[in-house]
Swiss-Prot record:
Subunit structure: Component of the ER-mitochondria encounter structure (ERMES) or MDM complex, composed of mmm-1, mdm10, mdm12 and mdm34.
Ranges for region Disordered: 293-313, 346-566, 596-615
Compartmental location: Mitochondrion outer membrane
Name assigned to this protein: Mitochondrial distribution and morphology protein 34
Species the sequence originates in: Neurospora crassa (strain ATCC 24698 / 74-OR23-1A / CBS 708.71 / DSM 1257 / FGSC 987)
Keyword Transmembrane attached: yes
Length: 615
């Protein structure tokens, strides 16, 4: 089976090209054009070339004398070309503003002026490859359907080829536009051409162009208003009104109501602000009046809108809260808490919006405790004995007179831990003095050892330990690194031995007082513990008695009312639970006896690791 396709009649017919150009021009101007194109697109040249497309028959579905249906594979790489002419906008700002609403555009004066440039585009070197479904009928013409995108490549030449980015932009844009044209518009164009060639009777008659009905301009002066006056308030005759024109000047404008003109102007410009995306603003009423005088209640004085503003305080206020703790002073440790500073900026966020709630008027309570009083001037104490005799009085005065926001210097003897004593090199540990040692020291004071100069000793009784050891701290600055030169007893003053004996006696009295205070404290603690134990025992006895009484009452009630049906099940459950608990305890005991090493290891794992001790 052979087919003969004659390409020469199409290329030689001049009327064919004219009809094809008209159809292509209509198709190019049918769809909306981009804003950069400011004029219609005209097809100036169209040439199919001398090289026909290559057709390969893949399938024939229907074949007769007057109809044909088949699937073809088309490949075209000929010398056809197409030339288009139009005008483009060279000012991009004009293109941007023309595509945006007027109420959102900046509206420049001269920068957005139009600048149009003629453009000529030539499409050549067209390469097509596609699968085509072709249906031919003498009654219905030729129908072509592309199953895929037929355009492979295309060369675009224009008047802006010297500018690289413009050439690339045109190449990309025209290729995209031409693909849509071939897939959508080209089959319709070919169908209309086939009807003109083979079926002239089936060509649809074009609708007669409707005559453009120009709207007649309405002259408002044709029906002049009653009692018309000019700008100066003088009445006008009907003859004078007919001689006026719309562009006559202020005399013509005075014939109309200024109020109505203002309303019409506001109505015409209302679309500039009536946006659908207007945000909802609370406590705001939008009104469509042109001005304050146009309202019906214009005679009344307008209500003043309250000024809504927020005030924030930026002045900071400092408050000092002091606390006192007698127990801490009794132990010799000064209690010092950091001051609480409340700045104004910290409470600004809490104060904002306080008027929104019903409980907003409630103010924050501020309690200021003033523990400051007249500072007591403590008399200088020269000897240790005087400080020990006035220890109780000075302790109470310091706790009441000295504010806790300042450093407190206790006059009582401070207790020092033994760990700190072992670490310091300036502290000496020795046994507490007894009567024998004090007398021996008093007798040795006259010997050669008494030649050492006197050193002030500060007694600091330590915590109660098993050995009842006490620590006495000497000032390290009083001990020079080099040994002091020994002097004979004859060079020392005669009153030196008496001073040493007095100091030894005072030291012994201090130790005795401290020991007595410690014993009293221990006795008080023991008495408190005994009282607590007695109270706990009494409470336990009372609880047991109450439980016994309740059980007796329940038994009496059960005896009177008889056993309830549910009580038997409760008793059985309690007995069963007791039996199970005993069985579990017995098994745990047996398991521990079988493998005691495992349980000992598990207990050892619960012991925490030793604390870190630096070497």
């Amino acid at each position: 089976m052979a087919f003969n396709f004659n390409w020469s009649p199409l290329t030689a017919d001049a009327g064919f090209y004219e009809r094809a150009r008209d159809l292509l021009t209509t198709a190019l101007n049918k769809s909306p054009k981009p804003p950069i194109i400011v004029d219609d697109i005209f097809v100036t040249e169209l040439n199919l070339g001398s090289v026909p497309p290559d057709l390969e028959i893949l399938e024939i579905g229907d074949l007769a004398e007057d109809r044909f249906r088949g699937i073809f594979k088309m490949c075209y790489s000929g010398d056809a070309f197409l030339t288009l002419a139009t005008r483009v906008q060279a000012n991009p700002l004009n293109t941007y503003i023309s595509a945006k609403p007027s109420f959102t555009s900046p509206e420049p004066l001269t920068a957005s002026s139009s600048l149009t440039i003629p453009l000529q585009i030539t499409l050549s070197e067209i390469k097509l490859s596609a699968f085509i479904i072709l249906v031919f009928s003498k009654q219905k013409g030729l129908t072509i359907v592309f199953r895929n995108d037929p355009l492979e490549s295309l060369k675009v030449s224009s008047t802006f080829d010297s500018i690289q980015f413009v050439r690339d932009y045109l190449q990309k844009t025209i290729e995209m536009k031409l693909r849509d044209l071939i897939m959508d518009e080209l089959p319709a164009i070919i169908h209309r051409l086939s009807l003109q060639l083979w079926c002239p009777d089936q060509v649809p008659k074009e609708d007669e162009e409707a005559k453009e009905e120009s709207d007649a301009a309405i002259n408002p002066l044709a029906t002049p208003p009653l009692d018309a006056v000019d700008a100066h308030g003088h009445r006008l005759d009907p003859a004078e009104i007919s001689s006026l024109s719309l562009d006559g000047g202020p005399e013509t404008q005075s014939l109309f109501s200024q109020k109505n003109l203002e309303k019409m102007d506001a109505l015409a410009s209302a679309h500039r602000t009536s946006s659908l995306l207007t945000p909802n603003i609370l406590e705001v009423v939008f009104r469509a009046w042109a001005g304050q005088s146009d309202k019906p209640d214009a005679t009344a004085t307008p209500a003043s809108t309250p000024n809504l503003h927020r005030t924030s305080s930026y002045q900071g206020s400092v408050h000092t809260y002091t606390f006192s703790d007698n127990s801490s002073q009794a132990s010799g440790h000064a209690l010092s808490r950091p001051t609480l500073v409340s700045m104004g900026s910290a409470t600004t966020g809490l104060s904002l919006g306080s008027g929104r709630h019903s409980k907003a008027g409630r103010k924050k309570k501020m309690r200021v405790v003033n523990l400051r009083s007249k500072t007591a001037v403590s008399e200088p104490v020269s000897e240790i004995g005087s400080t020990s005799s006035q220890a109780g009085d000075s302790h109470t005065e310091a706790s009441t007179r000295t504010p806790m926001s300042e450093p407190v210097i206790p006059t009582t003897i401070r207790e020092v831990p033994e760990d700190d004593l072992a670490a310091s090199q300036s502290k000496v540990r020795f046994r507490p003095p007894t009567d024998a040692t004090t007398s021996a020291r008093a007798s040795e004071s006259s010997g050669p050892r008494a030649a050492v100069p006197s050193v002030p000793v500060t007694a600091q009784p330590s915590r109660a330990t098993s050995s009842q050891e006490h620590v006495y701290t000497r000032q390290p600055s009083m001990f020079p690194s080099s040994p002091a030169p020994q002097t004979s007893a004859q060079e020392m003053p005669p009153s030196y031995s008496s001073r040493v004996s007095e100091k030894a006696e005072s030291t012994a009295s201090i130790y005795a007082d401290a020991k007595g205070q410690q014993q009293q404290f221990q006795q008080q603690q023991q008495q408190q513990q005994q009282q607590q134990q007695q109270q706990q025992q009494q409470q336990q006895q009372q609880q047991q008695q109450q439980q016994q009484q309740q059980q007796q009452q329940q038994q009496q009630q059960w005896g009177r009312a008889g056993p309830q049906p549910d009580m038997s099940s409760v008793i059985l459950e309690q007995a069963w639970i007791t039996k199970i608990a005993g069985e579990i305890a017995r098994r745990v005991y047996d398991e521990k006896n079988r493998n005691p090493a495992f349980w000992e290891d598990s207990h050892q794992h619960d012991i925490p690791p030793p604390a870190y001790e630096p070497r």
